[in-house]
């Protein structure tokens, strides 16, 4: 045992140097103390927290920027569609037609009519025995009409008409059928069948978190055209230079001022907790009115 002790600690000396060496080792052990470990963990936690905070900020900024881009695309697409359709209001319509129906509903609503294929029309040469009877346009070319499309029949004497759905076109016989539904009345000889378009634009606020710009063509179900559009306003410029919310007659309208407001899909917590918004305004000259 003594030899083993001497091998490990060295031989004892009178001066006690061996004891001093042992004390030195005990005073400076290898590794870290508990306090040092706690400090290191604290510093690491601060660094990780700061890095995570930077990541969250950048990630949130990226999400908001993506929403802003989508918002700008939606509002531009919606405005372009309305400009294109409203500019056509009244084109090719027979006399007595109302090409614009305005509604100051806040958000506003507008309905416009125009003939989308001018020249594609045929006259009925035989009075309809029943509202469900086919339209006999003997001697007229009906090849421009397509099945499964909307058309319009107009009685110039009664100055009335309606949309109907074409189910079959007999080009050789010049007959047009509408088997899905009868008309509201029997149209006389001399009534005209034509292609006419009707577009209705309005805001659907059924889901208050996601209002949408809706478009309805003829009698089809309304469809979403642009998402997260919260406001739509129309002002009608009259021939005398005055702008009104509801025009007294479409014939005195010369221009339509459109204001469209879009917002982001979600609120921005870094923007006072509110939605980011964009508003576009366009002045459309309605060249086919008042001619």
Q: For each predicted feature, which ranges?
A:
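N-terminal leader/signal peptides at the extreme start of proteins
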Residues: 1-32
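Short charge-dense sequence patches
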Residues: 21, 29-38, 177-183
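Aliphatic-rich helix starts adjacent to a transmembrane/signal segment
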Residues: 32-89, 291
């Amino acid at each position: 045992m003594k030899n083993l002790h001497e091998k490990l600690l060295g031989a004892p000396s009178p001066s006690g140097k061996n004891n001093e060496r042992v004390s030195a080792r005990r005073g400076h052990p290898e590794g870290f103390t508990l306090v040092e470990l706690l400090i290191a963990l604290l510093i690491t936690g601060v660094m990780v927290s700061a890095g995570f905070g930077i990541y969250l900020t950048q990630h949130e900024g990226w999400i908001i920027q993506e929403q802003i881009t989508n918002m700008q695309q939606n509002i531009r697409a919606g405005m372009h569609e309305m400009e294109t359709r409203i500019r056509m209001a009244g084109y090719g319509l027979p006399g007595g037609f109302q090409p614009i129906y305005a509604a100051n509903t806040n958000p506003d609503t507008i309905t416009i009519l125009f003939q989308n294929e001018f020249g594609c029309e045929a006259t009925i040469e035989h009075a309809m025995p029943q509202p469900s009877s086919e339209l006999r346009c003997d001697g007229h070319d009906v090849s421009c009409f397509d099945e499964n499309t909307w058309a319009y029949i107009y009685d110039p004497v009664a100055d009335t008409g309606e949309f109907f759905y074409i189910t079959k076109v007999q080009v050789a016989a010049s007959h047009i059928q509408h088997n899905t539904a009868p008309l509201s009345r029997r149209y006389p000889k001399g009534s005209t069948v034509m292609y006419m378009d009707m577009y209705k634009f309005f805001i659907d606020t059924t889901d208050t978190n996601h209002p949408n710009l809706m478009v309805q063509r003829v009698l089809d179900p309304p469809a979403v055209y642009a998402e997260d559009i919260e406001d739509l306003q129309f002002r009608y410029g009259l021939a005398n230079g005055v702008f009104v919310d509801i025009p007294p007659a479409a014939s005195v309208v010369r221009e339509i001022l459109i204001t469209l407001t879009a917002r982001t899909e979600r609120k921005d917590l870094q923007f006072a907790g509110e939605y980011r918004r964009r508003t576009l305004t366009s002045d459309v000259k309605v060249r086919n009115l008042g001619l």
